[in-house]
Amino acid sequence: MIHKLTSEERATQIAALHGWQAATGRDAIQRQFKFADFNEAFGFMTRVAIKAQEMDHHPEWFNVYDKVEITLSTHEANGVTERDIRLAAFIDSITA
């Protein structure tokens, strides 16, 4: 069984990430990204997709031209877990 983070654990973990925040109205974290153009945004999404597939943990995302919004939540746990934090940390590492 996957352990859903408590609100205290989630707050501590989010604080260690860059730009992530609690999603409104659900137990998830999200972040928005802006790139130079669509090619850069799509390249970023491709790198995230490869890592997500390796982790077997897939983001919810929305893309319009140079903007990407990512929401992370673990469906099996109905909330944020370490898997979300690990994927968010990876995403931070490729956007630093």
Curated annotation (Swiss-Prot):
One of its GO terms (molecular function) is 4-alpha-hydroxytetrahydrobiopterin dehydratase activity. Keywords: Lyase. One of its GO terms (biological process) is tetrahydrobiopterin biosynthetic process. Pfam families: Pterin_4a. It catalyses: (4aS,6R)-4a-hydroxy-L-erythro-5,6,7,8-tetrahydrobiopterin = (6R)-L-erythro-6,7-dihydrobiopterin + H2O. It comes from the Bacteria. Its EC number is 4.2.1.96. HAMAP family: Pterin_4_alpha (MF_00434). Belongs to the pterin-4-alpha-carbinolamine dehydratase family. This is Putative pterin-4-alpha-carbinolamine dehydratase.
